[in-house]
């Protein structure tokens, strides 16, 4: 089973991706984690990517695409869930070309829908657990408010990502995501239009529901 998942920062995309990964034993390929690995390792591609990430800008395709495609080609036998890529219409087209060229079947594309202002507030309230960044903790969402400065799931220490508190950086990321001409929403639309003739299923989810509500809807459609 091979899945693409779309959703703005703050939509719970990472959480839902982790749940699907666990249920179906998929490789969860998250472009941000790939970037962080390269940045932490001090690779040439990583250092180039960091310059753009620090400014809240889209990392150029000639840096991103080689990283992502390499990981897809070495993924496990149960398939993969690709999270955070493609982020533009150009990347969407190039990814589809690569999948077709390699004979890789795409089974599902998921889009989590969330208004921009709601997404922004969720980002600024997000707290990351030292043990698992996908443990849900957000001071602005009643259902997943942390226990003081401790993770509500495991009790681990919580921290903020600096760019989660930078409104300018958030706005830049959302400018890219919500751009329905060339940005990430346009990339999602590309796959939505392609789905009927390409043979994969396109799933739209209401991101304003609770984690459990979204999960139940998603799992009911991944069949």
From Swiss-Prot:
Q: Which reaction does it catalyse?
A: AMP + ATP = 2 ADP
| Enzyme Commission code(s) on record | 2.7.4.3
| Alphabetical list of PROSITE patterns matching this protein | ADENYLATE_KINASE
Q: Where's it found, cell-wise?
A: Cytoplasm
Q: Which family does it belong to?
A: Belongs to the adenylate kinase family.
Q: What is known of its domains?
A: Consists of three domains, a large central CORE domain and two small peripheral domains, NMPbind and LID, which undergo movements during catalysis. The LID domain closes over the site of phosphoryl transfer upon ATP binding. Assembling and dissambling the active center during each catalytic cycle provides an effective means to prevent ATP hydrolysis.
What is the name of the protein in this document? Adenylate kinase
Protein's organism: Maridesulfovibrio salexigens (strain ATCC 14822 / DSM 2638 / NCIMB 8403 / VKM B-1763) (Desulfovibrio salexigens)
This protein's gene is called: adk
């Amino acid at each position: 089973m091979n899945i693409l998942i779309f959703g703005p920062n703050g939509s719970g995309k990472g959480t839902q991706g982790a749940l699907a990964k666990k249920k179906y034993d998929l490789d969860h390929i998250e472009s941000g984690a790939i970037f962080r690995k390269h940045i932490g390792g001090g690779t040439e591609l990583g250092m180039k990517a960091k310059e753009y990430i620090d400014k809240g800008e889209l990392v150029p395709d000639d840096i991103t695409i080689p990283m992502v495609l390499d990981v897809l080609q070495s993924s496990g036998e149960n398939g993969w869930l690709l999270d955070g890529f493609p982020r533009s219409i150009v990347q969407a087209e190039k990814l589809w070309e690569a999948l077709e060229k390699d004979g890789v079947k795409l089974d599902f594309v998921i889009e989590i829908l969330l208004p921009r202002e709601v997404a922004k507030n969720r980002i600024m309230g997000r707290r990351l657990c030292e043990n698992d960044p996908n443990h849900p903790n957000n001071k602005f969402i009643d259902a997943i408010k942390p226990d003081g400065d401790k993770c509500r799931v495991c009790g681990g220490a919580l921290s903020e990502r600096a760019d989660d508190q930078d409104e300018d950086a958030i706005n830049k990321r959302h400018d890219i995501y919500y751009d329905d001409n060339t940005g990430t929403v346009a990339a999602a639309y590309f796959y939505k239009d392609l789905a009927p003739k390409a043979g994969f299923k396109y799933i739209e989810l209401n991101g304003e529901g609770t984690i459990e509500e979204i999960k139940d809807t998603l799992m009911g459609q991944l069949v």
